[in-house]
């Protein structure tokens, strides 16, 4: 899994990764953020919260890294 779309979106919105942890509407833990930074999977509910808060779709923030399949 690749979250490169999310990282790019955060840059475009002038936000840091820690904003995902600090934002009460998203409310992810620092360990979840670490998992995402390593390209590990997280729950759909987390992705949904991120999309709702950043006003985007799943495809904007996550993609399949076919080189790792």
Describe the residue ranges of each PLM region.
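Short, charged recognition helix plus adjacent turn
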Residues: 8-9, 62-69
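Residue-level recognition of specific faces of alpha-helices
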Residues: 32-35, 46, 60
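Short, basic-rich loop-to-helix N-cap that marks the start of a DNA-contacting helix
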Residues: 39-52
């Amino acid at each position: 899994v690749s979250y490169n779309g999310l990282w790019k979106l955060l840059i475009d919105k002038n936000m840091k990764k820690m904003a995902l942890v600090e934002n009460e509407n998203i409310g992810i833990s620092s360990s979840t953020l670490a998992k995402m930074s390593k390209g590990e999977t997280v729950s759909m509910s987390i992705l949904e919260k991120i999309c709702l808060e950043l006003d985007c779709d799943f495809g904007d923030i996550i993609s399949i890294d076919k080189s790792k399949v």
